[in-house]
Amino acid sequence: PNIEFFLANVDPNGNSTNGIIRKYTEREEFLMFEDIFSNEITLDEVKFSETDGSDAWDTQKYLNIWVCNIGSLDVLGLELGQVYGYAYPPTNIDDALATLGDVVVPDWPVDMLSNDENVQGVVLHYTALGRNNPSANEDGMTENNLGRAAVHEVAHYLGLRHIWGDALAFFGDDGCSVDDGIEDTPNQDAASNFVCNFDQDTCSDGTDDFPDMV
């Protein structure tokens, strides 16, 4: 199906709007995890006014996108890098389990969904979008600006995974044997890590083989 997004012009209460809410917060940043031993994504606090974030609009009618300062990942003082965004698809764990095998979210890990529909949507780092953003590219990562990160995360929201199926080589996963659930994308061994090598071909897919970046 063809899907088209546009800024909302009517809010959940029926009032006219430009679809943008600017919320003042005392929080300097929102963290992915409060500590390295936690499975709770505390960054989701940006989605609730009670934790100094902003409440979602009806997720059955709106694609919510939160923009905030996402704290960089670090473990015991060792900085691991900056997360520019993440997304929850618009389905929950119970529905995914009940319809396993049907097209709900193709080949999407159930533990990466949420039963709380109020967190479903996209979160973006504030440096990763806007043509007149004075903070854009402050880290030198031009690959993420001008909405590229938004396109990437909205694709996740719609159920598209990374083409290496999110295999983790660190834990011994073989990306060539882990699929993304989409038949016409080539297998890829691992993430390209921002290197745009259009000739790279890390997996052999037989007669229908294509480079990783097509």
Write out the residue ranges for each language-model feature:
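Extracellular low-complexity, Gly/Ser/Thr-rich intrinsically disordered linkers
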Residues: D205-V214
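Metzincin-family zinc-dependent endopeptidase catalytic domain
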Residues: P1-D201
